[in-house]
Amino acid sequence: MSDILNTILARKADEVAERSARVPLAELIARSADLPLTRGFAAAMQASIAAGDPAVIAEVKKASPSKGVIRPDFQPADIAVSYEFGGATCLSVLTDVDFFQGSDAYLRQARDACTLPVLRKDFTVDPYQVYEARVLGADCILLIVSALEDAQLADLSGLAMQLGLDVLVEVHDIDELERAVQVPVPLIGINNRNLRTFEVTLQTTLDMRAAVPRDRVLVTESGIVTQADVQLMRSHDVNAFLVGETFMRAAEPGESLRQLFFAHD
């Protein structure tokens, strides 16, 4: 399979140039100056875990490069309401247009419809996108270690924290994890999907979890489909989850979430 991530990153560089030509960075910086406080993404995750509950980041995702359109009848506001009712701790909303058929408008619609903190799920490679996320109303951004140099990781995470945004730093292997723990953010995501091949195995999280510092929240991402998957993770003290496709294929995403994570309660 072709290297999807490199293709996406090349497009992101062009996208940033196009967007900054329309809305200059100086304007975004000015607009980010006096915004309300964010909803506290990391704090919400920590609170759910402290209460003994699974901390679920429920994803609002229409499509993906590997699966095509996942949810043809895609209503972000309705999905957000359903997720909140189903017990989600936070939301993740895809805003990448070209590869995931996402939209900035989807993030606004989802966030306005609920009280949950929201992650802007995109490929952040430039400070422009961090300011953009804050202005859009995001509470957290994603930084993918395999897409960034160490200096970029430090600069982008530092800028995000300066703007009041939380950061989820995503890794896929132990070398990336060693780089990620140098970034002083509380959320580390282990993606069970290899972003270069899009293949998935839960063993990725199990193999790496012991190397995640105890003061960080380990979020397992991708491949959580059954209650047995959830129980496997929780039996290994992995209590934070990012789940998208499983819910997006259900008629009622929030009910699917409740069944997967809370049906035993």
UniProtKB/Swiss-Prot annotation:
Pathway: Amino-acid biosynthesis; L-tryptophan biosynthesis; L-tryptophan from chorismate: step 4/5
UniProt keyword annotations, A-Z: Amino-acid biosynthesis, Aromatic amino acid biosynthesis, Decarboxylase, Lyase, Tryptophan biosynthesis
Gene Ontology MF annotations: indole-3-glycerol-phosphate synthase activity; phosphoribosylanthranilate isomerase activity
Entry's Gene Ontology BP terms: L-tryptophan biosynthetic process
Pfam families: IGPS (PF00218)
InterPro entries: Aldolase_TIM, Indole-3-glycerol_P_synth, Indole-3-glycerol_P_synth_dom, Indole-3-GlycerolPSynthase_CS, RibuloseP-bd_barrel
Catalytic activity: 1-(2-carboxyphenylamino)-1-deoxy-D-ribulose 5-phosphate + H(+) = (1S,2R)-1-C-(indol-3-yl)glycerol 3-phosphate + CO2 + H2O
Annotated signal peptide: none
Protein family membership: Belongs to the TrpC family.
PANTHER family hit by this protein: INDOLE-3-GLYCEROL-PHOSPHATE SYNTHASE (PTHR22854:SF2), TRYPTOPHAN BIOSYNTHESIS PROTEIN (PTHR22854)
Protein name: Indole-3-glycerol phosphate synthase
Species name: Xanthomonas euvesicatoria pv. vesicatoria (strain 85-10) (Xanthomonas campestris pv. vesicatoria)
